[in-house]
Amino acid sequence: MFRGHSNRSLDPKGRLMLPPEFREEIFRLVPDGRVMLTNNFDGAISGYPMPEWEAVEASFRAGNTLMPGFRDIERFFIAGATEVTVDKQGRILIPPYLRTYAGLDKEMVLAGVGTKFEIWDQGRFEERLRQTAANFNAHMEAMAASGVSLRF
């Protein structure tokens, strides 16, 4: 599992140094260090170890491609995806089109979100946390109404 968050920066070539605990989790799941990066709906980048990404793709294969909305979402995630490999120094190269999509310049946040991790522009991440805190009760009520039960 990927947990926690840390401030990071890109090197001049667009590479991101992963923290040791993230590298360990990736290599535990994927000995060759392959990760799939894709855009997400929050204006950030999601990173999936290959077994997790394969589950995402399987869920799309099971979907109804006759629905235009389904095709749009599939296109957004699958066409936006690119495979990268963690190098010997523990870095991943973030392609220019994903850096542009996520507004990444230099300062960013790497956030562990369970079975995946997210790469955020630091300002966007901080704003999203403020919005979440301001709407926390409404979010919890909406999840409870839809049958989601969380333990804290």
Swiss-Prot record:
PANTHER family: TRANSCRIPTIONAL REGULATOR MRAZ. GO terms for molecular function: DNA-binding transcription factor activity; transcription cis-regulatory region binding. Its main location: cytoplasm. Forms oligomers. Keywords: Cytoplasm, DNA-binding, Repeat, Transcription, Transcription regulation. CDD domains: MraZ_C (cd16321), MraZ_N (cd16320). Residues 5-52, 81-124 form the SpoVT-AbrB domain. GO terms for cellular component: cytoplasm; nucleoid. It comes from Solidesulfovibrio magneticus (strain ATCC 700980 / DSM 13731 / RS-1). It is found in: Cytoplasm, Nucleoid. Gene3D superfamilies: Transcriptional regulator MraZ domain. This is Transcriptional regulator MraZ. InterPro entries: MraZ (IPR003444), MraZ_C (IPR035644), MraZ_dom (IPR020603), MraZ_N (IPR035642), MraZ_sf (IPR038619), SpoVT-AbrB_dom (IPR007159), SpoVT-AbrB_sf (IPR037914). GO terms for biological process: negative regulation of DNA-templated transcription initiation. It holds the Pfam family MraZ. SUPFAM superfamilies: AbrB/MazE/MraZ-like. Belongs to the MraZ family. Coiled coil: none annotated.
